[in-house]
Amino acid sequence: SNSLSSLSARNSSRVRGSSFGESQSGLSPFSIDQRVSTSFHRQMTSSNLLKIYHDVLEHHLSCWVAETTCPYQVVKIATPEWSASWTNRILHRTIRLDHVAQSCKLLYLTPSEKKAASNALNLAVSAFATQWAQGSVRARRKYSTTSQGPNDSGAVINMMEDFDRTLQHYFWSQAHRALSDVAELDCYQVACAELIFSLAQRPWQPETPDQSPAYETPSAESIRSHVQSIIERDGPPIYSERAARRMHTLKFRCDSYNKGLGLKSKNLKHGIASMAREDRDTIGLLYWLAIMFDTVAASMYERPVVVTDEECRYEVQRDVVPLCDTNLPYRWDYEIFLQTSGEVSHRTSWPCSYDRAAEDVTRSAPVKVLLFRHVSYLQNALRKSSAPHQLEDIVFNTMLIYDYWNRTHGQFFKELVQDFVNVPQRIRGWFICISAHWHLAVLMLADLLDFIDENHLGLEGARNERSALCMIARLREDSCRELSDLGHVATLPTYLSTPSEDSPEFHHAVTEGTILTEPWTMILIRAFSQASVFFLERAKGLCDFRATSGFVCEFKTSLKEAENCIKALWLLGKKSDMAWDLAEALQQALR
């Protein structure tokens, strides 16, 4: 778009100024000198930032937010962008939707407000993309089983001087400020900017050797709490919550105007009706994206969803009669949501055609969201001290989703892992990320079930059945092992595969491993951290049974599986300070 094509010029004017003497937390548009400005044009141009955004976020949004799977979509005839070439679809359609909404009098924006919204979106894209800046010492370092420790003084000094780190702090600070300036402005560009910025982890300020705490090898008993303390440094999902609330407000306004409510002119209804089909569909796609982010973030951070079930009922659910024996009459039902009877008449098997594989992976995305939504139901029911039969009802429906996954997408994904080198690059990125998200939700579910059974909160019969089947232990072990397998293949450099004629040319910043194409880093951090701790604790437990014949084999296997997960975190650490610290801590525990 024109607004984004001028990003380089705008940033050029921002970074040109006097000497860079202020703290990074208080950067102003004129606080970076000519040296930095020149280096910016040499190392990190506007086209590079947009290329990274395109190769990471839009690459995944073409799978996550498809017309064929959007529950708020009526027309499903759009051609999916599954090929080796794709556009910045969501970005372009968001910008267009704001223009169309203004012409239909759905939005009232002054010229200065339009400029502020566009600026916020540009800066959110830049803040997101600079996470993949590859000039720092840390980004160039190769993986080794011998940790150098996170507080190596030389590395810290270099990190503080590295230009890419300056860019990360600068753009995060500028995007944060720009979004604060438009906090009261309801439009689609602001909501989209908030969604994008919610994925940009705030760069941490490096600690000097004198300020940083002594780095000691944690014991096996303390590693879980040590990992949790690092993860807790991440703040609440404020921007995804703001985006969900804003997107819900905009959809509420559109639905009201479409029915003739709140119109300031009788001619407005005709304006909405004359909106192009694609633009009306964009409203549904963006709303689904916001609900998806809200659902995953709410369960992951143990917070209430912004948009309740009753407020975000999907199209095919509107005619469903509410149940009379539940406090959540509009709870998402998996058979209705997925438009399936639960019976699996056909399962995709690998090898298969590219389109068939892409369709299967795309259809798995809503199943993942549905599981996170049910994890949230269980969290809320426990907070409310719901009756045992209500808890078991949620558990039963959640396990239906789990079983459905294992009979369909789960089996297909295992086959993709086994033949990973022959899987097309875009399919790799899609299924690796969705699968890792799924397994994090399963691990969260296992923790909740453990809490229910340990505290005798559910029904005795159901508790005894879970105990007899070792269900909770199986949930944890299966998901952790699959995460280990994912960590192994997702850290293989993409250049090891034989490229086909239709292989996309990804930006070099994401070619060191498929895992680097993940846009929502926090999900993978939590998933691989939990799996790492699981295997390290298992290895520690095996030490108590050294006399058994299978000790050596099982012990080595546990350590190898832990290392697969730690390496995944280490590679994520090239763009995430949190992942870097976790990889260092877990690697110390591994030794």
Language-model-derived ranges and their functions:
Residues 127-352, 417-418:
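Acidic, Ser/Thr-rich, low-complexity intrinsically disordered regions in fungal proteins
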Residues 77-112, 256-281, 336-355, 413-427, ...:
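Acidic, Ser/Thr- and Gly/Pro-rich intrinsically disordered linkers and low-complexity segments
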Residues 122, 126, 147, 165-180, ...:
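Hydrophobic core segments within long, regular secondary-structure runs in both alpha-
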Residues 3-177, 183:
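Transcriptional activation interfaces
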Residues 413-431, 442-591:
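Fungal C-terminal regulatory tails
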Residues 328-431:
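Long, internal scaffold/assembly segments composed of regular secondary structure
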Residues 121, 189, 279-282, 286, ...:
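Structural signature of alpha-solenoid helical repeat junctions
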Residues 123-124, 128, 185-207, 369-372, ...:
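Amphipathic alpha-helical repeat scaffolds of TPR domains
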